[in-house]
Amino acid sequence: MFFDGGSDIARYDEVKWPQIEKITNRQLGFFWRPEEVDILKDAADFEALTDQEQHIFTSNLKRQIVLDSVQGRCPNIAFLPLCSLPEVETWIETWSFFETIHSRSYTHIIRNVYANPGEVFDNIMNIKPIVECGNDISKYYDDLMAVSYTHLTLPTTPY
């Protein structure tokens, strides 16, 4: 799966791990676009919430945006350079793609319930607990990327 040299062409007629191929195909079957979901009622429901409930709702979306931003990028950046099987590459790319769909769905919700979505987005990275939550996850990717960068760039010896 990993560290066996890069994969060349994407062949799906011969896969080493059919379970990975099955997971990818199943995941692709769940594809959807946020705009396909009617959320017109959400704005009215949001307005009916108390200020405290609106705060909880919005804070949850902010946290999810940060987490899905990390998960939408980091698996590709961290794992793909190490990957050696096309079916695993495709699964990783599919996983990251779905995380970006999640993030886009939160944007879709925020656009629908806030007159000025910038009010929500502009301060996300100023909320310490949310930033720390993102850092708690991204540190593992950062560590892997640092080690793999060193591994991938070290000169090799013929013996």
PLM region spans:
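Single conserved hydrophobic/aromatic residue that forms the stacking wall/gate
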Residues: 151-159
